UniProtKB/Swiss-Prot annotation:
Protein name: Protein MGF 360-4L
GO biological process, one term: taxis
Organism: African swine fever virus (isolate Tick/Malawi/Lil 20-1/1983)
Disulfide bond positions: none
Family designation: Belongs to the asfivirus MGF 360 family.
Function, as annotated: Plays a role in virus cell tropism, and may be required for efficient virus replication in macrophages.
Length: 386
């Protein structure tokens, strides 16, 4: 049951009674639990967002209601916990972050499942992934050792690998193993970059500036050229262009990332040399399916090789030809022996840096592409060779 004090706060906040406050009022508002971050607490019924002072709902520092509840629980702010639940926050998100018995008991009184910490953790993780609740997830997991320790070590990494392999998470990490805290932060940060969730990215870049270079690397690898453009031109975050291109090429089918590095000035021939050297290309040859041998190369780095040549990389340099022979790859040799089939694509020759124009150009390239798909092309060439 909510006290008169909580109901009074609800009315005062919803009517924006503190929108015009004097500096002398700050201490009183803080003592009454009516202060949030850097100003009087505010709430938007339509957006279900908790704000501070003159902040708008779209501000990077505004809080989704469930996330605000988690913060209030961590800080043991009893009246705010009751208030946020009254507005519709899910109290189960709160109980898993309760640090004291008193706060945990309050969450149970407000309807939380006492067993949620034992039986609901995995379902919650999946829910947060499906709903793309990045900031809520970080509010729950980051610096919450009790939750991280409740995961079995093997299961924890299975959950991380369920969405991503961990290659990109360790890009700039010198130590072989990260703490769970750092790993879970990077996991959700990477998730935001992958799905182009602008508000979480901006919030996290503001809160964790030491990860700026890693953010740029991740955006390149995932082909989020909006974020590459923002980091490179608006924040002046820099990385050697050929290193950027290497990261772009490391992900099969990353046309956007590869093109953007090319447009910035990366060396295409150098990129092609690195691609041909990737061990994964040697996975191209055979796979047994129902007793028949089928070529299995669509998922390899050949698509990136194909695209680099479309951009203008020269596959017929002496160094590249020697690398191909060293690889002893029949398909690669056949592909590179057909000079009329592999050549620059006219649509890709202009260097464009505006992300919206790049998306249009790559879409046009895909629609006008006249080459065979790699699997069909390889089969055709092998048949011709025989």
């Amino acid at each position: 049951m909510n006290s008169l004090q909580v109901l009074t706060k609800k009315v005062l906040i919803e009517t924006k009674a503190f929108s015009n406050y004097h500096e002398d009022d700050i201490f009183i508002l803080q003592q009454l639990g009516l202060w949030w971050e850097n100003g009087p607490i505010g709430f938007c019924k339509q957006c279900k967002m908790v704000t501070s002072g003159s902040m708008s709902c779209s501000d990077v520092d505004s809080y989704e209601l469930d996330r605000a509840l988690v913060k209030a629980v961590k800080e043991n702010q009893t009246d705010l916990i009751k208030l946020f639940v009254l507005w519709g926050a899910d109290i189960n998100f709160g109980i898993i972050c309760a640090k004291t018995k008193q706060t945990k008991d309050l969450c149970i009184q407000l309807g939380a499942d006492p067993e949620f910490l034992d039986v609901g953790l995995y379902n919650m993780f999946v829910y947060l992934v499906k709903r793309k609740k990045v900031l809520l997830a970080i509010e729950i997991y980051y610096d919450n050792i009790s939750i991280l320790d409740s995961f079995d070590s093997h299961d924890f990494h299975v959950l991380i690998d369920f969405v991503y392999n961990r290659f990109i998470l360790y890009l700039d990490e010198k130590e072989k193993e990260m703490t769970r805290n750092t790993l879970v932060l990077r996991f959700w940060y990477k998730f935001a970059i992958d799905f182009k969730l602008t508000k979480p990215i901006r919030y996290l870049s503001k809160k964790f500036p030491h990860l700026d270079l890693w953010r740029l690397q991740t955006a390149i690898y995932l082909g989020n050229i909006d974020e590459v453009h923002h980091a490179y031109f608006q924040e002046n975050i820099r990385l050697r262009l050929n290193v950027m291109m290497f990261l772009a090429c490391a992900r099969p089918g990353n046309k956007l990332g590869i093109y953007y590095c090319f447009a910035l000035g990366a060396d295409l021939d150098h990129a092609l040399e690195r691609l041909i050297s990737f061990n994964s290309i040697n996975r191209e040859i055979n796979r047994k399916i129902s007793g028949k041998t089928r070529l299995c190369i669509e998922g390899s780095y050949l698509s990136n090789i194909y695209f680099c040549i479309g951009l203008g990389a020269n596959p017929y340099t002496k160094k590249i030809q020697e690398t191909i022979k060293q690889k002893n790859s029949n398909i690669m040799i056949l592909l590179y022996s057909k000079k009329k089939i592999l050549s620059p694509h006219s649509v890709l020759q202009n260097k464009i840096l505006d992300p919206s124009d790049v998306y249009k150009m790559i879409s046009t390239y895909k629609n006008t592409e006249s080459f065979y798909p790699f699997s069909s092309l390889a089969v055709k060439l092998i048949q011709q060779a025989k």
